[in-house]
Design a protein with these regions (language model features):
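Secretory-pathway glycan-assembly enzymes, especially type II membrane glycosyltransferases
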Residues: 25-268, 274-275, 400-402, 414-421
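Short, well-ordered loop/turn elements at secondary-structure boundaries
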Residues: 5, 144, 202-205, 240, ...
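Classical eukaryotic N-terminal signal peptides for Sec-dependent ER targeting/secretion
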Residues: 1-12
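Catalytic binding pocket for nucleotide-activated donors in carbohydrate/polymer assembly enzymes
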Residues: 274-402, 406, 410-411, 417, ...
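N-terminal signal peptide
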Residues: 14-30
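A generic structural signal for short, solvent-exposed coil/turn residues
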Residues: 6, 15, 142, 200, ...
Length: 426
């Protein structure tokens, strides 16, 4: 009986904490706050809507990823897309359920999956297909015929020479500037952020804030999310760091979002869609901690006029290598989160803080729109095709059936014609 009573007390205490957090958020809700401004067009600021404007991202991310494969000499039998799928993806249920193939033929984009493809990853494949098609139809990009493998999972696949052919992924493992996976990074198209988000500086709450699902796994005691949660609950650090419920942020936001998709992603165990930033921007500092992979919400935080504090991590998205610590954001060691927040709030630091905030917003405004992401994808496909030699991909796509829908068995049966890349000449 005593054990049951003790358990009941614990449950009631947890319920009280959750209700308290929800009440605090609703009290400070910005859903009706007219001073939160979404800015679609910023006079004097540029968008990277040409390949020339995107060269900084190509130089830091795309070209290095492609060069890994350009420098390799492989035996002809080891280079086929079908061989890559057959030898590795079919031998791991976990990898297979997140593996898709994207085909572009005569300007039309197709997504093909295995029969047991996980529904949780469907939004990531569908968003690539639909967004590339939208910008292709709008005349903003011109996609070459191609066939490529897309990894929709939260982790890279091409570790320790795992990939014999380039594989498009959203996440890469990079430590001390050295890649530990060979995935070719491409943009995540499923969570668009197009607008800057501003809030009056003199009305910002002088705290660091992080969005988090209240029932999410925060990892071991030494992880960034776990430590920030612990600081937020502490008597002293709690005055400087606050945790907001991501689900409540989404429910009360002015920004309409697909909440059912967020629920599916959260329940399925993949990183859930990040909440809109219109409540987070009300704080002086916004904090980003990775989950078991890169936090997709970092892009939205960079759009705000709050300083971004990013927990140190080895997970990278396609644009991370173009960001600079101390220029666009402040990187912090999770165990020193409280000290970083205090330092950034000091009066003497505000000139530097404002400069970093503007640099971050300019970066996000210029490089992270959906149109810029679609252009990056177009360039990635072009560079990928070059690896196989002139005309190779066009001939490969021509082998696919034209009188019915393309299926995975058609990809597995592709003829692997010789190419200059296979012969080690590229």
């Amino acid at each position: 009986m005593k054990i049951i009573t003790f358990k009941c007390l614990i449950v009631l205490k947890l319920l009280f904490i959750i209700l308290k957090v929800c009440a605090e958020q609703q009290e400070g809700s910005s859903a009706s706050d007219p001073e939160v401004q979404y800015i679609a067009d910023k006079p004097g600021w540029d968008r990277a809507w040409t390949h020339a404007a995107l060269e900084p991202l190509y130089n830091t991310s795309l070209y290095p990823d492609v060069d890994v494969f350009r420098a390799r000499v492989r035996f002809p039998s080891a280079l086929g897309i079908a061989n890559q799928l057959r030898k590795y993806h079919l031998n791991s249920t976990r990898v297979k359920r997140g593996t898709a193939v994207v085909v572009v033929r005569a300007g039309t984009v197709y997504g093909i999956t295995f029969e047991d493809f996980s529904p949780a990853f469907r939004i990531r494949l569908d968003s690539v297909v639909s967004e590339l098609q939208r910008y292709q139809d709008g005349g903003y990009i011109k996609l070459e015929d191609t066939v490529f493998i897309l990894n929709t999972r939260d982790v890279p696949v091409c570790t320790l020479g795992y990939c014999l052919a380039p594989l498009f992924s959203y996440i890469k493992d990079i430590r001390n500037g050295r890649p530990y996976s060979d995935d070719l990074l491409v943009p995540l198209m499923s969570y668009p952020f197009e607008k800057l988000v501003d809030y009056p500086l003199d009305k910002k709450i002088p705290q660091g804030v992080m969005a988090s699902y209240m029932d999410e796994a925060v990892g071991t005691e030494s992880t960034c999310r776990s430590l920030v949660h612990r600081f937020a609950r502490a008597d002293v650090a709690g005055d400087y760091i606050k945790i907001l419920d991501s689900e409540l942020l989404t429910a009360t936001s002015k920004d309409s979002r697909d909440r059912s998709a967020a629920k599916v992603a959260h329940v399925s165990g993949i990183v859930a869609p990040p909440p809109p930033p219109d409540q987070l921007v009300r704080y002086s500092l916004v904090m980003s901690c990775d989950y078991q992979t890169a936090n997709p919400g970092l892009a939205s935080l960079l759009h705000t006029n709050s300083l971004v504090l990013k927990g140190r991590s080895s997970w990278y998205e396609y644009y991370y290598r173009a960001l600079e610590n101390g220029v666009h954001f402040v990187e912090f060691e999770p165990g020193f989160a409280e000290e970083e927040v205090k330092d950034a709030l000091k009066p003497g630091a505000q000139a530097k803080v404002r400069a970093m905030v503007e640099a971050a917003q300019r970066f996000a405004y210029k490089y992270l729109s959906q149109r810029s992401r679609a252009l990056f994808f177009e360039k990635a496909i072009s560079e990928y095709n070059k690896l196989f030699g002139p005309g190779y991909m066009k001939a490969t796509v021509a082998d696919l059936p034209a009188d019915r829908s393309i299926q995975m068995r058609d990809i597995m049966a592709l003829k692997m014609y010789p190419s200059s890349w296979r012969q080690g000449l590229a």
